Amino acid sequence: MTAIHKKLYFRLRQSLASTLFLKPQPKPMVFIGEGSTVQLSKAIGRFGLRKILVVTDKPLHDLGVLNTTLEALHQAGVQTAIFDGVLPDPTAQIVDDGIVCYHQERCDSVLAFGGGSSIDAAKVIALGAANNCNTAGCLGIGKCKLPAVPFFAVPTTAGTGSEATFIAVISNNETHAKDAVVDPCLIPKAAALDPEIMRGLPKHITAATGMDALTHAIESYIGRWETDDTNYYGLAACRLVFDNLAEACRNGDNLQARESMALASHYGGLAITNALVGYVHAISHNLGAKYGVPHGLGNALLLPHVLELLKEDATEKLADIAVYCGMGARTETSTALTRKLIDQIWALNDEIGIPRTTDVIRTDDIEGLITAALTEGGNYPSPRFITEHECREVLRAISS
């Protein structure tokens, strides 16, 4: 297939996919602020549910972070069962184990409590449980006949925005690929953005997940599927990140900064629900699948490099972001404003301790990574397609 044919093929696929992604989607009821997990628990009780499966990871469970929420659920008349087998980049086997646990415990609903991995796993558990199938039966776009069982979310990191999206990403250990489950019913009925839960988050996780939120905001804004709503959420998320991420990293006890970052993450999730992402995610997903690079860290490493590639094709939109975030005025040229934005991203990365390179990329793997990243990236509404040469240069630039 020639390069021109590939472009036509991917644009056709994007056109077909846009019929789903550009439709208005439901938004979760959101409780925000200290104690919002208790408010969510009370709301779950009002849904008339009997027993909820709490999907989380073992470290959070062992630390007792769930205790307040569990007690609030019990006071609301909701019994709980806990599945704490989620690991970073959850696999189909982990999700299948969660589905088995759901049925064994005779639950009627699911609560995700954790980072993006726990939320993604919980989404597919809720969908698979409703359809009496395993993960394989859920993979793809709208593969299941029945909607997910009632599903709720408490994100414990501020970055993925997964509590606002209808996509779940599942890792395939055999192919080193990321598989997706896409269904509007994966959007939670309600979520809590509680900064108190995020208070103890380590600096390096705060930094990486925060840059994930910024990447969502920027890629959704400069992409070809933007709407008035996604533009609003994207710009708002950008400003929240630039105003609060460094402070959240410096002072994790600053609950106002934590809450602002949680809101930035949520807004980023709302933006990508319709506008999707771009090549930063396409490359980062493959670094995560191949080497286990944390998703937020991969995005942070790649974001300024990919924007350098696309700056001529997205100058006006990048300039919009710079002005909205107070980096310059409209009296300046769009080129100058774009330069300020990219430089500010570099400066923010440095300030919060994001490294400029990684030592995990093996030279022998680069061509395979390029193929996988460009195949994935071709499905996203990026301002333009990037070339193999450009992708190769980006990978070399972040390799130490």
What name fits each language-model region?
Residues 275-340, 346:
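C-terminal catalytic subdomain
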Residues 214-218, 261-269, 303, 345, ...:
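Short alpha-helical scaffolding segments that buttress acidic/His motifs in well-ordered protein cores
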Residues 4-5, 9, 318, 325-400:
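C-terminal charged capping/lid subdomain of soluble metabolic enzymes
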Residues 61-133, 247-258:
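N-terminal small/polar loop signature for handling phosphorylated ligands or for N-terminal nucleophile
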Residues 93-196:
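Glycine/threonine-rich beta-strand-loop-alpha-helix active-site module
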Residues 167-275, 389:
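Carboxylate- and glycine-rich phosphate/diphosphate-binding segment that chelates Mg2+/Mn2+
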Residues 1-82:
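An N-terminal, well-structured beta->alpha segment
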